[in-house]
Amino acid sequence: MATTIFGEHYISNQEYAKKLILAGLKQPTYRIEVDYIDFKVRGIGLSYFCNGERVSSGLFEKPGIYVLYENYPGADNCLYCGISGNSANNRIRRFMKGLCDCLRHDETHAAGTKARQFGVSFKNIHFKFLAEEDFPDKHNCILDDRYMDEYVASLLNTRFNKKVKQ
């Protein structure tokens, strides 16, 4: 635990990021399947699967943190970690559009685009999602939530996130 200048103990961003990772590891792994790509209108259709069963994208229409993997989740496969204040589904979709080279002129997702440029295929992307409502208790924390995904990304050694200095 970190200590303030007044001698009070608190949980730092780094320590809280570790708690998020542990909570996220308990979540199911989802597979993303690209149903179609329409280059004319710059659209994409996605389906999500868990244990071979199709699941609704509505599960991810809420705030939370998500981690995308190439192939199955593992130490060397972590592509990107993101956090959404509204809909994780929208952010996952934007990453996939960047990966499929299907972004409109008014859309960007640097990590998705960079992953495509480094040869990552959209055909075997998996992810884990932790809804904000399931985040660990923030009692006794002094957090900067704006950068929490970067702290998690740094611990997971993602390939396409900006990294925070430790």
PLM region spans:
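Boundary/linker segments flanking structured domains
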Residues: 1-79, 83-166
